Amino acid sequence: MAGLLQVRDALALRATSGAQLSQSLATPLPLVQAMLDRLTAMGKVERIEQDDGACLSGGCKSCPQPRGAARCSTG
């Protein structure tokens, strides 16, 4: 199970959603959500709301894959 610092580091490296963090860290989603809420309250991370088609990394302009492609790591 992941700790608070592992969640913070994984978020910094991957910039992914809570569900993806939960899966990659093998930690229950409610616990990951609670950790993200705690990190937000501490000012260590900032919640960014994105629409469904938005790129998580902001690298879509340079991404060789079409936007929304299954293998694209940025879309």
UniProtKB/Swiss-Prot annotation:
Belongs to the FeoC family. HAMAP family: FeoC. One of its GO terms (molecular function) is iron ion binding. The keyword Transcription regulation applies. It comes from Serratia marcescens. May function as a transcriptional regulator that controls feoABC expression. This is Probable [Fe-S]-dependent transcriptional repressor. Keywords: DNA-binding, Iron, Iron-sulfur, Metal-binding, Repressor, Transcription, Transcription regulation. Iron-sulfur cluster binds at C55, C60, C63, C72. InterPro entries: FeoC, Tscrpt_reg_HTH_FeoC, WH-like_DNA-bd_sf, WH_DNA-bd_sf.
